A protein has these predicted regions:
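Bacterial N-terminal signal peptides
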Residues: 20-30
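Cytochrome P450 core scaffold surrounding the K-helix E-X-X-R motif
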Residues: 50-51, 206-214
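Short, well-ordered junction/capping motifs at the entry into regular secondary structure
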Residues: 169-196
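Active-site microenvironments of metalloenzymes and redox enzymes
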Residues: 63-164, 267-271
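Disulfide-stabilized, aromatic/cysteine-rich ligand-recognition loop
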Residues: 35-37, 62, 118-119, 123-125, ...
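Bacterial N-terminal signal peptides that target proteins for export
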Residues: 3-21
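Short, solvent-exposed loop/turn elements at domain surfaces
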Residues: 47-55, 73-78, 87-88, 234-240, ...
Length: 274
């Protein structure tokens, strides 16, 4: 930031607004590149709750890096300052609904310092994707999110443990009016935190999640909103918490925002060679 200091007021006035915007973007990218912590997630296979075919064959997941924690309110504030087109009041209506960042005092002021380390919410898919791209990443695919979220502190796949599943389900008993805590919960075996128990999270391919109703119910499948080729296996009751996430995501449009929906980013890693 010494460049801005040395320029002085007169020098800043001579700069074009476009150059200043570009400079802010560069500062944001350089700052986040060094400060944000990502954890490496090794390659493996995933038996997803999404039945991709009749046999529900395991999915191959290549190695990637995932943000250790969800994006915070403070980090999102820094992003919209550097990218004014994503500020509340400036963002195109196509990219955000009326609830976008409504919890902030102004388009660039959180209004409460306590919000800073809490997960960013009330953010659309479009804004979340733009943030990740500015950070050199992208939103995770559903398979990447589910793969990382299957792990506990010691196991890469803890989904067969009833006690672990019960702990996750306990999150749903928390009153909706309870203020969200700061990010930084216990890490799983990969070093990733807060995949459960804090907020729902956007995924890149949220609109490719297909909700398939339980054949034992009277639900009309035409009343369910879906697109894509995946189908949720609603018979898999032990993964109820994950199914709830898919049901929520499949009901959303990319411009939607809610007070319980946040996001985190992933980055590609070089493919390992034998």
């Amino acid at each position: 930031m010494s460049l801005l200091t040395n320029l002085g007021v007169a020098g800043l006035r001579m700069m074009s607004s476009r150059f200043l915007a570009g400079l802010l973007i560069a500062v944001f990218a350089a700052t986040t590149a060094g400060a944000v912590e990502y954890a490496g997630v090794p390659a493996g296979t995933l038996t997803s709750v999404l039945a991709n075919d009749a046999d529900n064959a395991p999915i191959a997941v290549i190695r990637y890096a995932m943000r250790v924690t969800p994006v915070t309110q403070l980090e999102l504030q820094q992003f919209v300052v550097a990218h004014p087109e994503w500020q509340r009041g400036r963002i195109a209506r196509t990219f955000a609904d009326g609830g976008y960042l409504q919890q902030w005092r102004t388009p660039v002021d959180l209004g409460d310092a306590a919000l800073g380390q809490r997960p960013a919410t009330n953010v659309s898919w479009f804004a979340a994707q733009a943030f990740c791209e500015a950070e050199g990443g992208r939103l995770p695919t559903w398979a990447q999110w589910e793969y990382a979220a299957a792990a506990d502190a010691t196991r890469r796949d803890a989904r067969g443990d009833p006690a672990w599943l019960a702990k996750i389900l306990a999150w749903y008993a928390r009153p909706a009016t309870t203020a969200l805590p700061a990010v930084g919960g216990a890490a799983n075996v990969y070093g990733v935190r807060d995949l459960h128990g804090l907020v729902w999270e956007w995924v890149d391919d949220f609109n490719a999640l297909l909700v398939s109703p339980d054949s034992r119910t009277g639900d009309d499948p035409e009343k369910l909103k879906f697109c894509g080729a995946g189908a949720i296996n609603l018979q898999d009751r032990q993964n109820y918490a994950v199914l709830m996430r898919i049901a929520l995501l499949s009901s959303l449009d990319a411009a939607d925002s809610t007070s319980s929906l946040g996001f985190r980013c992933v980055r590609s890693l070089p493919t390992e060679t034998p």
